[in-house]
């Protein structure tokens, strides 16, 4: 009977522990050192998926919709779904060849996503840089004009490639703090992205 009662108590404690929220890390004593370690860890993430809500404001137009992004190494697939019958745009490819598809239109092919988006939509996104910005990293190969960190060693602000990026929220995904809300601003374009779901691997 004693062993039975002890087993019940132990099982109850295990179940309670499983229901408790994950402990958030404490602020870093050295955010810059934590940031260096964080960059090395994030750079190892090659395969991921995200979905979220996107708002785009250009000079004369504005759109809202859903964004789904899949990254597999250098291969990517981006799907924009716009509400109220505004349609969808699918963009996929790699650093050498990119294809854009829209309903009832012939596929468009080019060597860069920026070229295709500028031709089809009238505005362009730095897709090659966004791949890294979405993870909370600077894009390699572009000088960082300015950046700032929070007390946990995560990016708060980043100025790179003519874009101003602000990270307003992070969420814990498989032991990584990944962005949950990002604002991106360019002289001719503003984006607001709320990421609802992350999946790594």
Swiss-Prot record:
Any one cellular-component term (Gene Ontology): cell outer membrane
Domain of life: Bacteria
GO biological-process terms attached to the record: lipoprotein localization to outer membrane; protein transport
Signal peptide limits: 1-18
CDD domains: LolB (cd16326)
Compartments, record wording: Cell outer membrane
Lipid attachment, kind N-palmitoyl cysteine: 19
Protein family membership: Belongs to the LolB family.
Subunit text: Monomer.
Alphabetical list of HAMAP family matching this protein: LolB
Protein's name in the database: Outer-membrane lipoprotein LolB
């Amino acid at each position: 009977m004693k062993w039975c009662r002890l087993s019940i108590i132990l099982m109850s404690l295990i179940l309670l522990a499983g229901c408790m929220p994950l402990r958030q890390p404490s602020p870093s004593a050295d955010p810059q050192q934590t940031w260096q370690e964080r960059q090395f860890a994030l750079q190892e993430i090659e395969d991921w998926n995200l979905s979220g809500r996107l708002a785009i404001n250009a000079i004369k137009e504005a759109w809202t919709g859903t964004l789904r992004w899949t990254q597999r190494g250098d291969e990517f697939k981006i799907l924009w779904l716009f509400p109220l019958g505004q349609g969808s745009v699918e963009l996929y490819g790699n650093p050498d060849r990119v294809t854009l598809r829209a309903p009832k239109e012939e596929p468009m092919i080019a060597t860069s996503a920026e070229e295709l988006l500028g031709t089809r939509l009238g505005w362009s996104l730095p897709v090659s840089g966004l791949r890294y910005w979405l993870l909370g990293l600077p894009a390699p190969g572009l000088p960082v004009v300015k950046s700032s960190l929070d007390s946990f060693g995560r990016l708060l602000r980043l100025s790179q490639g003519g874009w101003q990026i602000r990270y307003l929220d992070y969420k814990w995904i498989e032991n990584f703090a990944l962005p949950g809300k990002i604002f991106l601003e360019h002289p001719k374009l503003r984006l607001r992205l709320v990421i609802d779901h992350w999946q790594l691997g």
